[in-house]
Each structure stands twice: as C-alpha cells, then as structure tokens.
C-alpha cells in the first residue's frame, strides 16, 4: 500500500485510514465515494474507470502536498480504484487526520474537489440503453456549461 495510489482491487478502507493515525492527531475524516445507481435521472448499470497511472499518482501526491501547505500538521492518504465497478463499490477513498476536526473536514473536501479538477482519471458510465466516456470526473458537458459553451 502506498500513501497515494491507483488500484484495481477493492479499496481497503482500514489500511488507508490507519496510514493517517498518529498520536498527535485528534481527528480522522474518511470520505468514500461510491458508485451510485442513478445519475441525473438515468439508471447506471456500472462504471469503468481508466487512468494514466504514473501521472494520476503524481497528481494525488500533489494534492497531498497542497493540503499539507494549507493545513499544516495533516496526514493524507488518497486511493482511487480503476477498472469495472459495480453499484455501491468504493471508487475513491480520502483519509485525512489532523490535530483538530475542522482542518480534517476542510482538507478532505478540498481533496475530492482537486481530484476532480487535476487527476487524469476517466470514467465510462454504462446505462441500460448505452454508455458514455466522461473526459474527466467532472465531465466535458459540465465544463462547457460553466463556460457558457453548451
């Protein structure tokens, strides 16, 4: 197990949480993002994730560095799963510990937002009647809407 990694097997929640444990930390916040069945009114059968693994792991570590700069004293572990995932499977886990809970919560939320912005991970949504590759986790359509280009 690495502190920041891309995996193909189910995510081991306790291992990544335990990585952040430290006698000086008073709070550990663990976020797990799961495959949901419904997105924008469309029923999802499953998802498939792909990543450029060396760059994705580098970007996950970069996010960890950003968190350590903004919230000194935090310890971060981030793992994202790739390959086919069923409904309710864990796709991403972020564990952040800090001396106090406020920083752990804020850093954890920052991490998931940054993952969606900078980590080269793509997902394919498979529905009952079709499929679509999403350019990155926020999706090209959402980016175009935000820029007024839809």
Swiss-Prot record:
Molecular function (GO) terms for this protein are: molybdopterin synthase activity
Q: Which residues form a coiled coil?
A: none
Q: Report which gene this protein is encoded by.
A: moaE
Q: Which InterPro entries match?
A: MoaE_sf, Mopterin_biosynth_MoaE
Q: What protein family is recorded?
A: Belongs to the MoaE family.
Q: Function of this protein?
A: Converts molybdopterin precursor Z into molybdopterin. This requires the incorporation of two sulfur atoms into precursor Z to generate a dithiolene group. The sulfur is provided by MoaD.
- What quaternary arrangement does the UniProt entry report? Heterotetramer of 2 MoaD subunits and 2 MoaE subunits. Also stable as homodimer. The enzyme changes between these two forms during catalysis.
How is this protein named in the record? Molybdopterin synthase catalytic subunit
What class does this enzyme belong to in the EC scheme? transferase
Q: What are the GO BP annotations of this UniProt entry?
A: Mo-molybdopterin cofactor biosynthetic process
Q: In which pathway does it act?
A: Cofactor biosynthesis; molybdopterin biosynthesis
Residue positions annotated to bind substrate are: 34-36, 44, 100-101, 116, 123-125
Source organism per UniProt = Staphylococcus carnosus (strain TM300)
Report the domain of life of the source organism.
Bacteria
Q: Which UniProt keywords apply?
A: Molybdenum cofactor biosynthesis, Transferase
Q: Which reaction does it catalyse?
A: 2 [molybdopterin-synthase sulfur-carrier protein]-C-terminal-Gly-aminoethanethioate + cyclic pyranopterin phosphate + H2O = molybdopterin + 2 [molybdopterin-synthase sulfur-carrier protein]-C-terminal Gly-Gly + 2 H(+)
Provide the E.C. number(s) assigned to this enzyme.
Answer: 2.8.1.12
């Amino acid at each position: 197990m690495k502190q920041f990694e891309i995996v193909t097997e189910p995510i081991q929640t306790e291992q990544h949480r335990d990585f952040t444990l430290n006698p000086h930390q008073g709070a550990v916040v663990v976020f797990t993002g799961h495959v949901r069945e419904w997105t924008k009114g469309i029923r999802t059968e499953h998802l498939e994730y792909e990543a450029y693994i060396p760059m994705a792991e580098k970007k996950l570590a970069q996010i960890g560095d950003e968190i350590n700069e903004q919230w000194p004293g935090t310890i971060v572990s981030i793992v994202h799963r790739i390959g086919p995932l069923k409904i309710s499977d864990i796709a991403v886990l972020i564990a952040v510990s800090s001396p106090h809970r406020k920083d752990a919560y804020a850093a954890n939320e920052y991490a998931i937002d940054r993952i969606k912005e900078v980590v080269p991970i793509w997902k394919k949504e498979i529905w009952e009647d079709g499929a679509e590759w999403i350019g990155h986790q926020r999706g090209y359509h959402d980016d175009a809407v935000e820029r007024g280009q839809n």
